[in-house]
Amino acid sequence: YAITGDERYRWLAEYFYHNDVIDPLKELRDDLGTKHTNTFIPKVIAEARNYELTQNETSKKLSEFFWHTMIDHHTFAPGCSSDKEHFFDPKKCSKHLTGYTGETCCTYNMLKLSRHLFCWTGDSSIADYYERALYNHILGQQDPETGMVTYFLPLLSGSHKLYSTKENSFWCCVGSGFE
């Protein structure tokens, strides 16, 4: 749609609208619960792009609401979010400092969403998050010797990073990490 302006493609994009994910965000409601984290972020990126193409204010507001909700309530100090790929009650954050904290795909996609929002607003807090997540998580998940990457950024005291291998592991986060 962005390239052609052909409404058929816009209709197709709307076909993928996920009511269970997007509708609570339209109501500015944090209904993330224990749902799969990276199921949400790409769908919100699509809403951000929808705003850019159609000037739909609802898409803009829900994108901004989601971003602030993530950063203010669901993000750890290095800029990562999730535990074992899922949201959790932010009031129980300390119970989610595990070896499976901080899925790289989530941070990578939050950086993509951040770029959209920063272009709209120029808000320096978005750039601050971007810098923190890029340097502490994205760059921090790369093995300095081999260049391989991690699936998670473990935050549990005493835990260690498990890096991908060149031949035997190709998780989703390997692709996001390299991208």
List where the protein language model places each region:
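Glycan-recognition and catalytic cores of secretory/periplasmic carbohydrate-active enzymes
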Residues: 1-179
